[in-house]
A protein has these predicted regions:
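C-terminal helical "tail/cap" subdomain of flavin- and related membrane-associated enzymes
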Residues: 329-448
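Conserved mid-domain beta->alpha element of the FAD-binding
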Residues: 9-20, 25, 161-162, 195, ...
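Conserved N-terminal helical subregion
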Residues: 2-5, 55-196, 446-447
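Conserved FAD-binding catalytic core of PHBH/FMO-like flavoproteins
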Residues: 116, 130-134, 139-282, 286, ...
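Extreme N-terminal leader/targeting segments of oxidoreductases
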Residues: 1-7, 25-26
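Glycine-rich FAD pyrophosphate-binding loop
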Residues: 24-47
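Acidic/histidine metal-binding catalytic segments
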Residues: 73-77, 125, 264-279, 335-344, ...
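Conserved Rossmann-like nucleotide-cofactor binding loop
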Residues: 15, 38, 167
């Protein structure tokens, strides 16, 4: 870079804060505008889910700019899922090989840490309480309003990044006004509500903290991730309305109490006052946002602004962080030629965003309907056995997505091939008895 370029990032969330560190380290002058107050000072939620799952793609992006160790201090490893059935029986399924884990992290703590790093180490300037009203995409001009004072501001930059979430103002107020801009927003039939399961009186955990807990119940499910303070953030995913079990049926304390007592009995014993805590968090919707192109002129979208997805693969934050990795690699590949960078970023990254959205929806059905199914568990055991014997021939789809940096689009396509192979394998006579036999392993090998 011949001269120091000025960059504006709209959104001081997880992706915006991390990208500010990348740009600052690359010699750019960075200013961030955030519509919310400073979450480090205000008594507000960091928005959306309290807990997130951090995996290899996220760590890759964090470690590349030397901030991974700061986040590891506040991360809890989860080596597998624990399924809770109606009678309280537990079934454990490891996520990957021995020693592999995903990490439960607090959205608020990660966000606050990233803001600190962006300001202190990245020399970024963050302006809070500023709403983005409009962006001149080609000329790099942003119009904002201070939502406390009403003051209107015009800011100019060499580059603008919209990292302002699924309901991005950059996208809505500017990108979506472009001719032939492709855009769709689809809400799924299910919503979610969070519940905080407190620690025991002595501060200890009520369940194994090193696992993601799932109560699969067919059309709906409850999950729980551990927090640092001994509590668990639990999330109930269920249809908004229709059917016997839906959020529109849980309109009284009596209904909530009876629902948990009947459907999640072991959870109810840990939190008999669930009905009193029910209203602590609002009922929220789940949306998938697809759009294209992700960049135009001097402006690009990142994270949820470009590819918001449902949370059922635990990859939303990881995908947003991977956007930083991809843009950083392109920045060096094209020697800071942003016209070339944006063109390749938009074209090459879009298929991965689409694939992740498809993977996330499909994994919802897996988590909801199949994780407690003996045939599904056997299928996963066979895959794990074959992968252990022939690691160069088979990496399970979950491991491709969670424990590697393989492109989402490549993983998705490989997963389809693997699924077809396993469908044939599961038709083997007496598969339950000889699942780990050489005969079964040879059959998979012949189909690969």
């Amino acid at each position: 870079m011949e001269e120091k370029k000025n960059v504006i990032i709209i959104g001081a969330g997880l992706v915006g804060s991390l990208w500010a560190v990348y740009l600052s380290k690359a010699g750019y002058s960075v200013t961030i505008y955030e519509r919310r107050p400073d979450i480090r000072k205000a008594e507000i939620s960091a928005g959306k889910s309290i807990n997130l799952a951090l995996s290899v793609r996220g760590w890759t992006a964090l470690d590349a700019v030397g901030v991974g160790d700061e986040i590891r201090k506040i991360a809890i490893p989860m080596s597998g899922r624990v399924m809770h059935d109606l009678t309280g029986n537990l079934t454990y399924q490891p996520y990957g090989k021995e020693g592999q884990a995903i990490f439960s992290v607090s959205r608020g703590k990660v966000n606050a840490t990233m803001m600190d790093i962006a300001e202190k180490h990245g020399n970024a300037i963050i302006h809070y309480n500023h709403d983005c009203r409009k962006v001149d995409l080609k000329n790099g001009i942003v119009w904002l309003t201070n939502n406390l004072t009403g003051e209107e501001i015009e800011a100019k930059a060499d580059l603008i990044f919209g990292a302002d979430g699924a309901f991005s103002a950059v996208r809505y107020n500017s990108m979506q006004k472009l001719d032939r801009f492709q855009y769709s927003q689809n809400f799924i039939a299910d919503g979610y509500r969070e519940i905080l399961l407190p620690a025991n009186a002595d501060g200890s955990y009520q369940m194994d903290k090193n696992a993601l807990h799932i109560w699969p119940r067919g059309r709906f499910m409850l999950i729980a991730l551990a927090n640092e303070d001994g509590s668990f953030t639990c999330t109930l995913f269920m249809p908004h309305e229709g059917g016997e079990n839906a959020f529109d049926k849980l309109t009284s304390k009596e209904a909530v109490d009876n629902f948990f007592k009947t459907i999640f009995p072991d959870f109810y014993t840990m939190m008999p006052n669930i009905a009193d805590a029910w209203e602590d968090h609002p009922l929220s919707a789940l949306a998938i946002v697809r759009c294209y192109p992700w960049a135009h002129g001097k402006t690009a979208l990142m994270g949820d602004a470009a590819h918001a997805t449902v949370p059922f693969y635990g990859q939303g934050m990881n995908a947003g962080f991977e956007d930083c990795t991809v843009l950083n690699n392109l920045m060096h590949k094209h020697n800071h030629d942003w016209e070339a960078i944006f063109a390749e970023y938009s074209k090459e990254r879009k298929p991965d965003g689409d694939a992740l959205q498809d993977l996330s929806l499909e994994n919802y059905y897996v988590m909801r309907d199949f994780v407690a199914d003996p045939a599904f568990l056997l299928r996963k055991k066979i895959e794990a056995k074959f992968s252990e014997m022939y690691p160069d021939k088979w990496l399970p789809l979950y491991s491709q997505v969670t424990f590697s940096n393989i492109r989402y689009s490549v993983a998705y396509n490989q997963g389809k091939v693997q699924s077809e192979i396993m469908d044939q394998v599961m038709e083997t006579p007496e598969i339950e008895q000889k699942w780990d036999s050489q005969e079964v392993m040879d059959k998979i090998l012949s189909l690969c």
